Amino acid sequence: MAGGDIKKGANLFKTRCAQCHTVEKDGGNKIGPALHGLWGRKTGSVEGYSYTDANKQKGIEWNDDTLFEYLENPKKYIPGTKMAFGGLKKAKDRNDLIAYLKDSTK
């Protein structure tokens, strides 16, 4: 997995993710769970967010590799997720978004 461009990732987040997710420390849940503190967190574990059983039971920890695979096709990676996002097919886009998320969700 190649390093991504944070600026391009920020633009992808703004256009593809921000309507449902926040990255700020006190951003809170929207349609989707808050993403602050994402790295090292288990699927289905954000307090106050109503996950599907599929998300709660997946049991993986979010990191560069799991996000890279998930962001390509969320419904394939976690069948039963309620995330409506179709995914990012281009590896470069996924790398850019992951670079932004890694930087902005600390």
From Swiss-Prot:
Compartment(s): Mitochondrion intermembrane space
InterPro entries named in the record: Cyt_c-like_dom (IPR009056), Cyt_c-like_dom_sf (IPR036909), Cyt_c_1A/1B (IPR002327)
GO molecular function: electron transfer activity; heme binding; metal ion binding
SS bond partners: none
PROSITE patterns associated with the record: CYTC
Maturation and modification: Binds 1 heme c group covalently per subunit.
Coarse class of the protein's main subcellular location: mitochondrion
Entry keyword annotation includes Thylakoid: no
Pfam families: Cytochrom_C
Keyword annotations from UniProtKB, A to Z: Electron transport, Heme, Iron, Metal-binding, Methylation, Mitochondrion, Respiratory chain, Transport
SUPFAM superfamilies referenced in this protein's UniProt entry, alphabetically: Cytochrome c
Gene Ontology cellular component terms for the protein in this record: mitochondrial intermembrane space
Residues recorded with modification N6,N6,N6-trimethyllysine: 75
Residues bound to heme c: 17, 20-21, 83
Membership in a protein family: Belongs to the cytochrome c family.
Function comment: Electron carrier protein. The oxidized form of the cytochrome c heme group can accept an electron from the heme group of the cytochrome c1 subunit of cytochrome reductase. Cytochrome c then transfers this electron to the cytochrome oxidase complex, the final protein carrier in the mitochondrial electron-transport chain.
Name by which UniProt lists this protein: Cytochrome c
